[in-house]
A protein has these predicted regions:
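Conserved Hanks-type protein kinase catalytic core
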Residues: 74
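Basic, Lys/Arg-enriched alpha-helical interface segments
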Residues: 1-68, 77-81, 90-116
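Compact, Lys/Arg-rich rRNA/RNP-binding cores from ribosome-related proteins
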Residues: 87
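Portal/gating segments that form or line small-molecule/metal binding sites
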Residues: 71
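Conserved catalytic cores of phosphodiester-cleaving nucleases, focusing on short active-site segments
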Residues: 84
Length: 116
């Protein structure tokens, strides 16, 4: 099992929790189920649930009807996955701004906590 960590900004915002709090019940349930799959499978989780993006950033995917949630994350030493940010996606490509935000949060996490 992998430990799932929700990234918090220095001002104590939790972007993934904010996303989860905004989701409708069915989409929330599917998103939480996908996070559970990540917890159970770690880096072995593959499409359609998880996809590598770039710079060791990965994307979790959950779909309910026409809505698709994406939660970006990275792995750290000790069987841990850090969920950085997420959004509801309407297009095929992950927005560059979301990938850049995930990279920024990853760098911030590593600066504050190292690779623990």
């Amino acid at each position: 099992m992998y430990e799932i960590i929700l990234y918090d900004t220095e001002d104590e915002r939790c972007p993934v929790q904010e996303l989860l709090d905004s989701l409708e019940p069915k989409l929330l349930a599917k998103t939480l189920r996908t996070i559970d799959l990540l917890e159970m499978n770690g880096p072995l989780l593959r499409e359609p649930y998880s996809k590598p993006l770039e710079n060791w950033i990965f994307e979790l995917r959950a779909k309910q009807g026409s809505d698709i949630t994406r939660v970006l994350y990275f792995f750290i030493v000790g069987k841990k996955a850090v969920l950085t940010n997420g959004f509801i996606k309407k297009s095929q490509k992950t927005p560059k701004a979301e990938k850049e935000l995930a990279k920024k949060y990853k760098a911030d996490y590593e600066r504050r906590y190292g690779n623990e």
